[in-house]
């Protein structure tokens, strides 16, 4: 395969990953081997929907060096480790897929995927934690490669890396990994409870009984449909079901849902917030009923959402205040408000909050749940806010 062909294949694979739901926005990365000494990989901080072949970067397997002005993915080191260990591997994808990410936050070092998933081998290994892009993470991947015979590795508190002799094989490994992780979580629950079958709601209810802390104060009540909104020059547009209502700041007409006061207070107290999305996903609702502070179980939560997300039962001003240092807040019993400077940012926050909630619930059923350390969480948050988010904005322009 020529370098140009490999670049075009990587661009197409990036689009396929987004469409499949295995990655979103700039998360994850894709590479293709072009020789015994080089591979091409997606650039750092670029939206997959805007990539062209000219944006894909050749990288040395030996020393990770590259040429040109476009910076390759910060995770190029884990790709190089795989190409070095497996000369037959031609394609690697790093994903933040849901159930593999959920399992990465659980107290599980490895698990047997079973005969239905032959591409995963006899054991799926969870590589030890390392901050994104670090030598520590590369060493963890190197160790995991020596343990597993399959085409997928879970990365602790992060996601997964899947690989194969072809693009198709790598994609199938990623798809199989997602199914195998979901199967494993359910099988463990059924085994613990000695049940023949169960559904996701049963798992959530069980986890909630283990997590919930009593709340004796006053609780707000917001009736569905919940509201989304976006800031305008003279207030904000409130989306209630299929209706869009213009609202002037500080002047809420009668008949608006009570949630409108929250949006008004948030925009008043947080000038950088331009969009608010309400997550009523079952996992977010369940965690919002637990009266806890949600901490990062996954790297992308620490980076994009914050070092903690509080549960607030109180008045609008308290809800708005909880967003001073985070991009989301849990509304007691009513899910989460997810905020951003753009519609895409708010959607990303919503997706990540929901995934982190699922990780907490499922992880609780599987053993002890340990968040990412406060130091590492703060470091990732600062780096993201000062560097990576600006890089994304610049690339959009």
Predicted regions and their residues:
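Glycine-rich flexible loops
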Residues: 1-397
């Amino acid at each position: 395969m020529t370098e140009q062909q490999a670049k075009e294949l990587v661009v197409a694979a990036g689009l396929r990953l987004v469409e499949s739901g295995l990655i979103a926005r700039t998360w994850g990365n894709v590479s293709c081997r072009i020789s015994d000494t080089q591979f091409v990989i997606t650039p750092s901080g670029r939206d997959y929907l805007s990539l062209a072949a000219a944006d894909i970067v050749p990288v040395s397997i030996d020393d990770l060096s590259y040429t040109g002005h476009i910076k390759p993915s910060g995770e190029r080191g884990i790709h190089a480790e795989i190409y070095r260990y497996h000369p037959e591997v031609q394609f690697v994808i790093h994903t933040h897929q849901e159930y593999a990410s959920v399992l990465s936050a659980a107290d599980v070092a490895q698990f047997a995927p079973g005969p239905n998933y032959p591409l995963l081998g006899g054991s799926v290994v969870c590589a030890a934690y390392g901050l994104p892009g670090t030598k520590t993470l590369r060493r963890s991947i190197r160790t995991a490669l020596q343990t597993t015979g399959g085409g997928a590795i879970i990365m602790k508190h992060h996601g997964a890396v899947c690989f194969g002799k072809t693009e198709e094989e790598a994609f199938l490994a990623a798809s199989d990994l997602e199914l195998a992780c979901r199967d494993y979580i359910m099988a463990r629950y059924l085994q613990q409870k000695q049940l023949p079958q169960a559904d996701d709601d049963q798992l959530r209810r069980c986890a909630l009984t283990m997590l919930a802390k009593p709340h004796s104060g006053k609780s707000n009540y917001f009736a569905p449909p919940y509201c989304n909104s976006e800031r305008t020059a003279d207030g904000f547009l409130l989306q209630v079901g299929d209706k869009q209502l213009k609202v002037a700041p500080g002047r809420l007409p009668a008949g608006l849902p009570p949630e409108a006061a929250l949006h008004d207070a948030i925009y008043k107290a947080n000038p950088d917030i331009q969009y608010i999305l309400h997550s009523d996903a079952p996992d977010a609702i369940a965690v919002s009923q637990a009266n806890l502070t949600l901490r990062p179980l996954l790297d992308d939560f620490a980076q994009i959402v914050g070092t903690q997300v509080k549960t607030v039962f109180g008045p609008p001003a308290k809800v708005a205040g909880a967003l001073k240092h985070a991009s989301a807040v849990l509304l007691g019993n009513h899910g989460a408000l997810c905020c951003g400077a753009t519609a895409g940012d708010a959607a990303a926050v919503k997706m990540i909050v929901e995934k982190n909630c699922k990780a907490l619930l499922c992880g609780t059923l599987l053993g002890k749940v340990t968040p990412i350390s406060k130091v590492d969480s703060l470091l990732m948050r600062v780096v993201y806010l000062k560097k990576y988010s600006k890089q994304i904005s610049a690339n959009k322009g």
